[in-house]
Design a protein with these regions (language model features):
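Active-site mouth loops of central-metabolism enzymes
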Residues: 60-73, 96, 122-135, 204-208
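Histidine/acidic residue-rich metal-binding segments in metalloenzymes
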Residues: 134-303
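His/Asp/Glu-enriched, well-ordered alpha-helical/loop segment
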Residues: 200-228, 275, 296-303, 308-383
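C-terminal cap of metal-dependent C-N hydrolases
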Residues: 318-321, 375-428
Length: 428
């Protein structure tokens, strides 16, 4: 189908284009960008007046729970949630059942995603077999099957020597290592940040050092091996500081922040609500400020969701018993715009870079770029619309969000992937 997006404000970090223009899509590619392109060239015209036209968002960190936990989410519902959130590419984490530690699981996920005809799904491979931290997985085989990166997400590889071997293999194969930074020996049953709020609620806490010591270790190993390190869901002020210093020293490191970590602090927890239980936990206002400033200053380059759906039954338990995790695909863009763009931390161009261009550069895919000849992966975002988040409208199976009822300004209106409209609330 030939689609003409009319009158939108095109924001393209790859070229720094920042102006009102029309975008013509044909044969799954961007065909033309220009002023007043003739409508007769298109089979479908989408009026994007007053909206941003950005490269389709890329989420480097989601959990689609498939295979093994399809009661929480499956590839099809996960893709729909992603499309509703403006995402055209996502990286799914390997902590499934069975673990994505071999080419067969990589192929299963990719083939199932392709059959859904929605968005691009790239399965990340595990670092170790079964995520047991004892023996390296078949990393080369998974890369040949299309895995763009490796990760032990959900935990850290605590054996530093083994992890170093994994980093060396990743460096040899030219793929990044996505690091979940958590010293499991220091968690000690903690369920939220170790601060005054934890004491008030009578809950065991997780200190910042649980994250910080592994961030430090992994940066040192990246420097030692030359591997490309990407730090997942950073939550502490010292993580930001260490990334800054590492970059200044030439270490190949990048880092992501999740919307819940730059939006909420433990001060927002009025009670022991498991929708506020995620890993890493919400931190203090001081940490939130550091994360926002890190994104503003380009130290932290990526905004990812760590989309982690659970059933109502899973979350309808005590803080000690309920699993960690919240959904995020359908709230990330509006929260980023509401908290960071309107909050004065990011420009719309920086928002697009953090949510599309930078992830594409880190994982080495030719996306995150709206110009002729590039893939027609596009999101149309209305920066003016104000509404309340309603979890009951989510396409995801998960309803586990602390943002239900929150008023935000900025909404995804249309998502186009490979030249096909996969979500649309415009021109109805």
């Amino acid at each position: 189908m030939t689609i003409l997006i009319k009158g939108g404000h095109v924001i393209n970090p790859a070229t720094q284009m920042d102006e009102v223009a029309d975008v013509l899509i044909k044969d799954q590619k961007i065909k033309k960008i220009g002023k007043e392109l003739p409508e007769k060239e298109a089979e479908r015209v989408i009026n994007a007046d007053g909206c941003y036209v950005m490269p389709g968002f890329i989420d480097m960190h989601v959990h689609f729970r498939d295979p093994g936990f399809e009661q929480k989410e499956d590839i099809y519902t996960g893709m729909q949630a992603a499309a509703h959130g403006g995402y055209t590419t996502v990286l799914t984490m390997p902590n499934t059942k069975p673990v994505a530690d071999n080419p067969d699981i990589i192929n299963y996920v990719h083939n199932k995603a392709k059959s859904g005809n929605c968005i691009h799904v790239l399965q990340v491979g595990a670092v170790t077999k079964g995520q047991q931290g004892k023996e390296l997985a078949d990393i080369e085989g998974m890369v040949k099957a299309g895995s763009p990166a490796i990760s032990e997400d959900g935990k850290s590889v605590m054996d530093a020597a083994l992890y170093r071997d994994g980093m060396l293999e990743a460096a040899r194969l030219g793929i990044p290592v996505l690091a979940h930074c958590e010293d499991i020996h220091m968690v000690r049953g903690g369920v939220m940040n170790a601060d005054a709020k934890a004491k008030e609620l009578g809950l065991p806490g997780i200190t910042n050092s649980v994250e910080d010591v592994i961030v430090a270790r992994d940066i040192i190993l990246a420097k030692d091996t030359g591997a490309q390190l990407h730090l997942c869901h950073c939550s502490t002020k010292d993580s930001v500081l260490m990334v800054k210093v590492a970059k200044e020293e030439g270490v190949r490191v990048s880092a992501e922040v999740c919307p819940h970590h730059f939006t909420l602090s433990t001060d927002d927890m009025k009670e022991a609500d498991t929708n506020y239980k995620m890993n890493p936990p919400l931190r203090t206002k001081e940490d939130v400020k550091a994360l926002r400033e890190g994104l503003r200053d380009g130290i932290m380059e990526v905004i990812s969701t760590d989309h982690a759906p659970h059933t109502f039954e899973d979350k309808n338990r005590s803080m000690q018993e309920a699993p960690f995790g919240i959904v995020g695909l359908e709230t990330a863009a509006c929260l980023t715009h509401n908290e960071l763009v309107l909050g004065g931390y990011l420009t719309p161009m920086q928002m697009a870079a953090c949510m599309s261009y930078h992830p594409a550069q880190i994982i080495g895919i030719d996306k995150g770029d709206i110009q002729p000849g590039k893939a027609a992966d596009v999101v149309i975002f209305d920066p003016e619309e104000t509404y309340r988040i309603d979890k009951n409208t989510f396409a995801s199976k998960g309803r586990n969000t602390p943002f239900d009822g929150k008023e935000v300004t900025g909404r995804v209106k249309c998502t186009i992937c490979d030249g096909e409209v996969v979500f649309n609330e415009l021109n109805k």
